Amino acid sequence: MASISIRCPSCSATEGAVRNGKSTAEHQRYLCSHCRKTWQLQFTYTASQPGTHQKIIDMAMNGVGCRASARIMGVGLNTVLRHLKNSGRSR
């Protein structure tokens, strides 16, 4: 069985990192026994993925409401509102 050395991003300790459950996206979460911080190696933030902004704008242009867009895209309502608010600005 292969062993992977996991380093705490907060205190840089290589010993004392233990598994601590899973995130809602099913990524392994770790806990540092030295500084008591938690982290995960993979992190998926749906709102920052490429194409999210354009999908939200397209849905708004097709008459889909803000709450429905948030529910369909799997992001928060404030994320949809922020993308719509910033859609007039040049990127």
Swiss-Prot record:
Keyword Glycoprotein: no
GO biological process: DNA transposition
Tagged with keyword Hydrolase: no
Record key words, sorted: DNA recombination, Transposable element, Transposition
Its biological purpose: Absolutely required for transposition of IS1.
Family of this protein: Belongs to the IS1 elements InsA family.
Protein name: Insertion element IS1 protein InsA
High-level lineage: Bacteria, Pseudomonadati, Pseudomonadota, Gammaproteobacteria, Enterobacterales
Gene designation per UniProt: insA
